[in-house]
């Protein structure tokens, strides 16, 4: 499988940009040395500022260090992680949360929504179908349950969030 140009940390691990991501990873780990960081949200003010690029490369860098990482594309209107990783766009986060809402939360199967990537230790949950209510889904009881369940099976969850200016 072809390594995507956006995944500089995977494509060119000795580049200066990859070193910046490793430094960022180390700084995040150092800041949280007293307690284990499990969830990291990457966002921006406006679209096009590079949050998806930062999220994907930071996820790769944590995975390269041996951490089991799940990258969640929570930008349900304009999610790009599936294109960055060459994955299927759905089912994804919105589909998962909708299923959880309609069924008993203990009866759903998260594995249907998690996709492997070509990066060892890195899994992806793409944004999925565009829902009518993305903001409500992100703060829902189902989202909290999903995050709590995922924390049990990985070392770190990186969330590629929505630009703050667009959230209502």
Locations of regions flagged by a protein language model:
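P-loop NTP-binding module
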Residues: 1-168
């Amino acid at each position: 499988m072809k390594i995507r140009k956006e995944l500089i940390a995977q494509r060119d691990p000795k580049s200066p940009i990859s070193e910046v991501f490793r430094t960022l990873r180390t700084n995040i780990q150092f800041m949280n040395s007293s307690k284990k960081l499990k969830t990291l949200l990457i966002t921006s003010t406006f679209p096009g500022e590079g949050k998806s690029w930062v999220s994907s490369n930071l996820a790769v860098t944590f995975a390269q260090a041996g951490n089991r990482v799940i990258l969640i594309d929570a930008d349900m209107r304009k999610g790009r992680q599936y294109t960055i990783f060459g994955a299927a766009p759905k089912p994804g986060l919105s589909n998962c949360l909708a299923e959880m809402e309609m069924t008993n939360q203990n009866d759903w199967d998260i594995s249907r929504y998690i996709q492997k990537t070509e990066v060892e230790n890195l899994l992806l949950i793409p944004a999925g179908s565009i829902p009518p209510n993305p903001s409500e889904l992100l703060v829902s009881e189902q989202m909290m349950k999903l995050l709590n369940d995922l924390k049990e099976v990985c070392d770190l969850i990186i969330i590629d969030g929505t630009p703050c200016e667009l959230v209502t």
